[in-house]
Amino acid sequence: MIDWKNIKLDLIKFLKDEVEKTGLKKVTMGLSGGLDSAVVAILCKEAFGDNLNCVLMPSQFSSQSSTDHAIEVCEKFNIKYEIISIEPMVSGFIKNMDEDRLRIGNFSARMRMSVLYDVSSREKSIVVGTSNKSEILLGYGTIFGDIACAINPIGQIYKSDEFEFARLLGVPESILNKAPSAD
């Protein structure tokens, strides 16, 4: 049986230690409304309090329920957030190409990374990632996109194990029960 309470404490300490090494005090992360980003947001809130900035970055390909779930996490845990639509960037890109979902998805991930690093610069903060171990081992991510970050606290947790951890952290049932997506 996995000792999630100690893992939680270890990850919070890891986050604090790694950010302290940079000389910064704030963190920025993307919040999609999915399980991984909800888990990381809760860990970061416990580690950094109000020095956490979550960014929601919808596009025309994002589901409204994902944005709603991200806001639900922010409201439940009193996390400040901002919504920055990547729609203008994505629309400008896809108007001159075919509707290749993989290319659009990868482009969208890279636009989100650019937005996160810009917000991170503005806030004088460090970007925290949300990729779990299963995604990393399977190569399920976009190079220079959603896998780009300075630190990744859940990079050693398999997705199959993450649900139990998420319950301990208090991730809303609406997120625990929804099907995974690449939103």
Label every model-predicted segment.
Residues 1-139, 166:
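ATP-dependent adenylation/nucleotidyltransferase module used to activate substrates
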Residues 132-136, 143-183:
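Mid-to-C-terminal catalytic subdomains of enzymes
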